[in-house]
A protein has these predicted regions:
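Hydrophobic/aromatic-rich, well-ordered segments within soluble, folded domains that form packed cores
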Residues: 65, 69-71, 294-308, 334, ...
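Catalytic pocket of metal/acid-base enzymes, prominently hydrolases
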Residues: 2-31, 45, 127-132, 137-150, ...
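Short linear, low-complexity motifs centered on an aromatic residue
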Residues: 77-93, 110-113, 118, 216, ...
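Glycine-rich, acidic/polar active-site loops that bind/position phosphate-bearing ligands
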Residues: 126-315, 324-327, 334-571
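Active-site proximal loops enriched in glycine and acidic residues that flank catalytic Cys/His/Asp
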Residues: 48, 72, 101, 283, ...
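Composition- and surface-driven signal marking solvent-exposed, interaction-prone regions
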Residues: 220, 295, 317-318, 344-348, ...
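Active-site core of metal-dependent hydrolases
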Residues: 11-126
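C-terminal amphipathic alpha-helical interaction region
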Residues: 503, 508-704
Length: 704
């Protein structure tokens, strides 16, 4: 194991074209112009871009870069890139120069026809554009290809529609900035110039041995196991969570941290998660668009470094049945450029009128658009996880904690909030331990949307998904709530009276969304139904929320999406679901036909030979015969279920693409997949391990 010491302060951000590098390398005027673009949205002229491009190129070459790429996030859910070298056409001498222009920096032209567009673009309409997002720093990535200058960009069509996640994210950030500033001005704040959503996504993942991974076609093709019986031990002892990190995993984490720190990702926390072989990495907060980029870098780095350590990183939400799946807690807050966190309640929240207005606006936003928030976490893999006593329920509710709930109860019942519950001190009963301050409220891990001191934690997001979508929705629905509140308060004759009445009104009208209890309980499901809260269990049930009149009006009002963009994204979501389930079904068919059935046939022959041999020796062969009969019966069930899955999968392929096909995959194909898995998993508990054609769950999650 390497004992080489790392000086984090020295290496952090060394491969990032950050503010320090720009100040050092750019002429003062160019630097000021770029900062105006970053901070105020001023347009960048080509002359300035040329200077920036030249210095960026020189800096990247010093880092060993030979190529650059416009690094963007199309609607595939994973980053895309095309690499171009810095070399220009050869000179008469035969030598080449290294060049990179301002035009090449600010705009690229990838073929848009091969990316999902949901009908926005025909196949022959190939032109698309990438545009430099100068608010997210460029960085040099080091990998097997060498060193590449990665330039974060947005991606749009020839006619201007967003074909990516970043464009609407930036639009939503503009929306909440504008409306939050309106709200701050009402409270006399004249100093804050910009309000930015801050995001800190906690990334969960599994690690398995690469050799064992390569023996599982389901993991290779789908990212999750489609067959597999539980080993004798799972997670029931709670001994993996926060347990001692194994040496192999620790070495992996060390390399991950080093690579992330070099590209400016503030990897902060790492630990074992609940399930065996499951782990978590969490960064420090960053501005939303940078946090989204950083999370993509985190996922890429986890996968790349795992391979270097002879492992595979699984980012699927549910790679193994029977143990916890993986999510990505999206910690969200809104902060000003001069350091004000608008979600900080202070020591006496009942006296903090601005905070109470912000809080009740957020309650209104979540209550009005719970379906949209749920849709933002919709993913085929997440269907296995949500509502399964390991992740938040599929019902959106807000946890506020005792202190804030008490303040709102006072407002609702009496019209005045006169006090806030205090935290006090925690008594341990041990004199040698320090006195600990006790928070005013506990935490609730079963809540999908929880207030945790000075931020909200949205816990529904899937582990492999970009955090762009939930933050687009959060930013936009809160911008709407702020805008509506400002429309009322800006017209008020008596601001203090009007804001008091509005806080009480919002608290009362949106009380149903607040729930501080056990989100895993069946009682909550019944209570939520009585409250009229939507319970959306599957991705296909969630997708329609994107294209309701309410959603279209919301997103068009704040310039985040057009109706056409929303319709295209809904279409892509349906296609994504259908394709994912189709691949899983075809993989199950392939594995059952080519691996399991041949193995079962061989094993029944072995059992039959054993029965005959024992009987021929004059001994009692009833036990052997009983095992043979059981295996034969389960093999028959497997063949019947396999034929049924083949039939229904072919039927699904013939359905019209879109909602009809996706719903058929959900209602008919997925249950047929479960029906095939059941007898195979039973057989795994009977068949000789030497005869089983692939590594078991025990091999995968306990031998890494």
């Amino acid at each position: 194991m390497s004992t080489e010491k790392i000086n984090v302060a020295e290496i952090f951000g060394e491969n990032v074209f950050n503010d320090t590098v720009m100040q050092e390398r750019l002429p003062k005027k160019v630097y000021k112009n770029l900062k105006k673009t970053i901070e105020e949205g001023k347009e960048l002229d080509l002359e300035t871009a040329d200077v920036i491009a030249h210095e960026m190129k020189e800096w990247a070459i010093e880092k060993g870069a030979t190529h650059y790429t416009h690094w963007f996030l199309p609607l595939t859910g994973v980053t895309a890139e095309k690499h171009d070298s810095f070399i220009s056409a050869p000179q008469p001498s035969g030598k080449v120069l290294m060049s990179f222009s301002g035009k090449e920096l600010i705009k690229g032209e990838p073929d848009a026809s091969s990316f999902p567009s949901g009908g926005l673009r025909a196949t022959f309409e190939a032109r698309g554009y990438t545009a430099w997002d100068c608010t997210s720093p460029a960085f040099v990535r080091e990998d097997a290809a060498g060193a590449t200058l990665c330039i974060p960009t947005a991606f749009c069509s020839y006619t201007g529609e967003a074909l990516d996640q970043k464009t609407p994210l930036l639009r939503s950030m503009e929306a909440i900035n504008k409306q939050a500033l309106r709200l701050l001005r009402l409270f006399g704040n004249t100093t804050s110039k910009k309000v930015t959503p801050s995001v800190g996504p906690e990334q969960e993942y599994f690690l398995v041995d690469a050799e064992k991974f390569e023996q599982r076609k389901d993991l290779i093709y789908t990212g999750r196991t489609l067959f597999g019986a539980m080993p004798p031990k799972g997670q029931e002892l709670d001994d993996h969570y926060f347990g001692t990190i194994r040496q192999r995993i620790a070495a992996f984490m060390k390399d991950v941290n080093e690579q992330l720190w070099k590209v400016g990702v503030t990897a902060k926390t790492q630990h074992n998660e609940v399930a065996p072989a499951q782990h978590e990495l969490a960064p420090i907060y960053a501005e939303a668009n940078i946090a989204v980029d950083h999370n993509q870098i985190v996922m890429q780095t986890l996968k790349r470094v795992a391979c270097q350590h002879g492992m595979k990183c699984l980012l699927h939400e549910k790679p193994f049945a029977g143990v916890n799946g993986s999510g990505k807690h999206n910690n969200w807050s809104i902060t000003t450029d001069d350091g004000i966190n608008m979600l900080d309640p202070g020591k006496t929240p009942h006296e903090n009128t601005q905070f109470l207005l912000v809080l009740t606006c957020i309650l209104r936003a979540v209550n009005m658009h719970a379906d949209l928030l749920r849709e933002s976490a919709a993913d085929p893999g997440n269907d296995h996880r949500l509502g399964a006593n390991e992740a938040p329920p599929a019902i959106i509710s807000v946890f506020l904690g005792e202190q804030l709930e008490d303040v709102l109860e006072q407002l609702i019942s009496t019209g005045e909030a006169t006090h806030s519950l205090k935290g006090g001190k925690l008594e341990t009963g041990v004199r040698t331990l320090p006195e600990l301050s006790k928070d005013a409220t506990d935490r609730n891990r079963t809540s999908p949307f929880a207030f945790t001191g000075n931020k909200f934690e949205f816990r529904m997001v899937g582990s492999r998904d970009s955090v762009a979508s939930p933050n687009i929705v959060l930013n936009t629905i809160v911008a709407e709530a702020f805008a509506d509140a400002c429309d009322i308060l800006e017209k008020a004759d008596d601001f203090d009276l009007a804001v008091h009445d509005l806080i009480k009104k919002y608290a009362t009208e949106n009380q149903r969304i607040v729930f501080n209890g056990d989100g895993y309980s069946e009682a909550w499901v019944e209570e939520a139904e009585r409250r009229g809260l939507p319970s959306i269990r599957s991705m296909v049930d969630a997708i329609p929320a994107m294209v309701t009149d309410k959603a279209v009006n919301l997103f068009e009002r704040f310039g985040v999406f057009t109706k056409a963009e929303l319709e295209s994204r809904a279409e892509i979501q349906y296609e994504t679901y259908a394709k994912a389930i189709n691949i899983e079904a075809r993989t199950m068919i392939d594995m059952a036909s080519k691996q399991f059935m041949p193995a079962f046939i061989k094993y029944t022959k072995t059992l039959a030979d054993t029965v005959n041999s024992v009987a021929a020796a004059g001994a009692d062969a009833s036990v052997q015969k009983e095992v043979l009969d059981e295996v034969t019966a389960l093999m028959g069930e497997t063949k019947k279920a396999l034929d049924a899955l083949v039939k229904v999968t072919d039927e699904a392929a013939a359905k019209e693409e879109g909602a009809e096909q996706a719903n058929f995959y959900h209602s008919d194909v997925f249950p047929a997949m479960e029906a095939l898995r059941a007898p195979v998993d039973k057989l795994e508990m009977i068949v000789d391990k030497e005869a089983w054609p692939m590594p078991s769950y025990g091999d995968l999650i306990f031998e890494v």
